[in-house]
Amino acid sequence: NNKVLLIEAGGKDSYPWIHIPVGYYKTMHNPKTDWCYKTEPDETMENRSIPYPRGKTLGGSSSINGLLYIRGQEQDYDIWRQLGNKGWSWNDVLPYFLKAENQERGQDEFHGVGGPLSVSDQRIKLPILDAFMNAAEEVGIPKVNDFNKGNNFGCGYFQVTEKNGLRCSAAVG
């Protein structure tokens, strides 16, 4: 029964576009909700800078991102552990992923239920996306049904942090 105080430099998450999934078009690059960072100019890109949206509101970047729910690669976590970061192997962090999520697919060895973060399948499935995935498979890129099992290589529909048509963020779960 622990409580966590979340402190953010930005304001409350009362801006309506924060909660609407397509609202990231109105929150990214908006100084009210985004720090509006840019990368350093890169000579390999003709000295262009690329926007690097970071949330400036309660919930941080989880309040302005594209809602994708994709964990890191299992091997990356294991490398962190091998570098001396105890508690950071895939097997160490997986229980926390399970505890955090309320997975609409239900509980299994890679997903949990009852946590504060609602995770659901992407609702929009378009023929052009299916054609893209079929083409990728034809050239040897595997289809992935679940990007959160530790091996993200491939293409497929991702899951999102959304519940009842609204964004789930660090501020609202």
Question: Where are the predicted features?
Answer:
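N-terminal glycine-rich phosphate/pyrophosphate-binding loop and immediately adjacent elements
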Residues: 1-99
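Conserved redox-cofactor binding core of oxidoreductases
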Residues: 81-173
